[in-house]
Amino acid sequence: MFAPRVFLSMIGALAAFAVATYYLNGSLASTAIQTLICAVLIQVGYFIAVLFLVWKEARERRRLSSQKQFMTAEAANDEKQPGKVSLRRLNRPHHLNS
């Protein structure tokens, strides 16, 4: 969500809302109040959308971090077990079987 585009779109939507409200009510005071309420609701929606995007990104980073830790721990366990040969060590370029 590109902020300047969102704000310009918000201003356009509020202007259209204000024109329609004034056309329906004919009252400038009522139009101003209803447009202000609409602006607050749009801002709350934008704030919730940004919070959702941040939450989603944080959740994805935590998931990737936990997978990375699991893979690192698994590789460390492969290296430490005495009877088990790690495929990672066999695939090294300086290994004699190459």
Curated annotation (Swiss-Prot):
Pathway it works in: Glycan metabolism; exopolysaccharide biosynthesis
UniProt record, GO biological process: polysaccharide biosynthetic process
UniProt function note: Inhibition of exopolysaccharide synthesis (EPS) and nodulation ability (NOD).
Lineage per the UniProt record: Bacteria, Pseudomonadati, Pseudomonadota, Alphaproteobacteria, Hyphomicrobiales
Membrane-related topology note: Multi-pass membrane protein
Coiled-coil residues: none
Subcellular compartments: Cell membrane
Recorded superkingdom: Bacteria
Compositionally biased intervals (Basic residues): 86-98
Record's keyword terms, sorted: Cell membrane, Exopolysaccharide synthesis, Membrane, Nodulation, Plasmid, Transmembrane, Transmembrane helix
Protein name in UniProt: Exopolysaccharide production repressor protein
InterPro entries referenced in this protein's UniProt entry, alphabetically: SyrA
TM stretches of this protein: 6-26, 35-55
Pfam families hit by this protein: SyrA
Annotated spans, Disordered: 73-98
GO cellular component term of the entry, any: plasma membrane
This protein's encoding gene: exoX
